[in-house]
Amino acid sequence: RDRAEGLGVEIFPGFAAAEVLYDERGAVKGVATGNMGVGKDGEPTDNFQLGMELHAKYTVFAEGARGHLGKQVIAKFGLDAGKDPQSYGIGIKELWEIDPARHQPGLALHSAGWPLDDATYGGSFLYHMADNKVVVGFVVGLDYQNPWLSPFEEFQRFKTHPNIRWYFEGDPAKGIQPGKRLSYGARAITAGGLLSLPKTVFPGGALVGCDAGYLNAS
């Protein structure tokens, strides 16, 4: 952040982009942030602050999967014409610190299927980072048919597999300490792949990341 600001980049934390702005030719000319200090009845309060208009020669939309503004731009310019419908998944991720004896820097593991049933798309990842840190996660396609399926519970079941839990379990007899979970999170991802990828440039801007659908789900 400091390097970016040193180069003249302005960062507005806490201000979400709420509206796409267009010029007289219909090209994107920027975005407007949402109004602040609006009551639950929709009326301005004493702390009301009007949103800002941010203009640019080129606006890059990077909101993540099915971004609020990105989907509007896709519809306005017909960017997904002739493409397969986009599909989505939910990815759940945890960051662990594990015993050095179980740490293998640079190791990357991927799996598909288990513990999901044959009708449900999904898979896992496990990456060994620096400083005895491990990132482990599980993705479940959001088109699953079983209404009782819990992606979180499936992730926890995945970690019970002998080849996975070995990294996190302790072994007192060998002086190996159990791992410690440091943080966790979840987010939606695009999973449609190349055939669902819309045109990503349009007058005045571009889509990147999951706003476009760049994730390689394979």
Name each model feature, range by range.
Residues R3-A173, G213-Y214:
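Predominantly flavin-linked oxidoreductase catalytic cores and closely associated redox partners
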Residues Y184-L215:
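FAD-binding beta-loop-beta segment adjacent to the flavin cofactor pocket
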Residues W166-L195:
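Flavin (FAD/FMN) cofactor-binding core of flavoprotein oxidoreductases
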Residues S218:
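An active-site-proximal "capping" alpha-helix that borders the catalytic cofactor pocket
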